[in-house]
Regions:
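Short coil/linker segments at helix-helix boundaries
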Residues: 2-25, 32-34, 45-104, 110-153, ...
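N-terminal maturation segment of proteins
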Residues: 40-41
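A cross-kingdom marker for long, charged
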Residues: 210, 217-265
């Protein structure tokens, strides 16, 4: 069932109105102080803003192996990192308190899956702490699998699994071999399938637009501009106030039509 408060917060998030999105999620949390999802979504606002500022969610970043697999060169935003870490800690505290009496509570598991996936992304792409990222990826995989066993229609969980599988699958073979020894596996094609499921499913209640963007960027890496353009068209139409979606759509249009989007009738 849709939650109007959360829907409004996500709308603001995908319109890159980060401060307003944070406040919407914080207000939702104030009305439900025991819910771990509230601070998890505040953390999502912080990380999404950092990604947006650093250009992580662009084709230039995603198509550059040195950047995608090596992380950003600039220093992280100290305030956003502080807010993100605080929201992560609050989420974990509330989720563990819930699971002390309800070990397989789907809401707590969903919050933990989101947090672990976001921590993995933050460690890998922003802080360039790959070993810590691998630890978070293992947590993501564990929590997501438990969650899907309890609530199999929680298709938002496939985004975290898919992004992890895809990025690890893009690593050189020698790095993947080290991760296999550490219990972290990666599979590009499986990752694409998992992200595709989140991008297409009505049951991906909150992260479907983000999954569409990730699918578009992965599709460009896999030389499938038609799939990328389809996702970006839908995003640009649904969120006209987000300049990122329109810019990425303009970049991929000449790849397909052979003409600049500015010259198109």
């Amino acid at each position: 069932m849709s939650d109007p408060g959360l829907d409004a917060g996500f709308r603001l998030l995908y319109e890159v109105k980060f401060e307003q999105a944070r406040e919407a999620f914080a207000q939702w949390q104030r009305e439900r102080p025991a819910e771990p999802l509230g601070p998890a979504l505040e953390a999502a606002s912080d990380l999404f803003e950092e990604f947006y500022r650093k250009g992580v969610l662009t084709s230039e970043f995603f198509l550059d192996d040195n950047r995608l697999l090596g992380g950003i060169k600039d220093k992280p935003d100290a305030e956003l990192e502080r807010q993100f870490a605080s929201a992560v800690q609050r989420t974990q505290k509330l989720a563990r308190a819930r699971m002390a009496t309800q070990p397989k509570d789907p809401d707590a598991l969903f919050a933990l899956t989101l947090i672990a996936g976001m921590q993995a992304d933050d460690f890998f792409l922003i802080q360039r702490r790959q070993l810590d990222s691998m630890h978070s990826l293992r947590e993501t995989d564990r929590d997501a699998r438990i969650l899907l066993g309890v609530a199999p229609d929680t298709d938002d969980a496939y985004l975290a699994l898919g992004v992890a599988n895809y990025i690890i699958g893009c690593l050189p073979a020698y790095k993947r071999a080290v991760l296999w020894v550490g219990g972290v596996h990666g599979d590009k094609m499986l990752g694409m399938q998992q992200v595709s499921r989140a991008a297409a499913s009505e049951n991906a209640r909150y992260l479907r637009p983000f999954a569409r963007l990730m699918l578009a960027l992965a599709a460009l890496r896999e030389k499938n501009p038609d799939l990328a353009r389809l996702q970006l068209q839908e995003l640009a139409t649904e969120f006209p106030e987000n300049p990122l979606f329109a810019k990425e759509l303009a970049k991929v249009t000449p790849v397909i039509t052979g003409v600049s989007s500015h010259d198109a009738p």
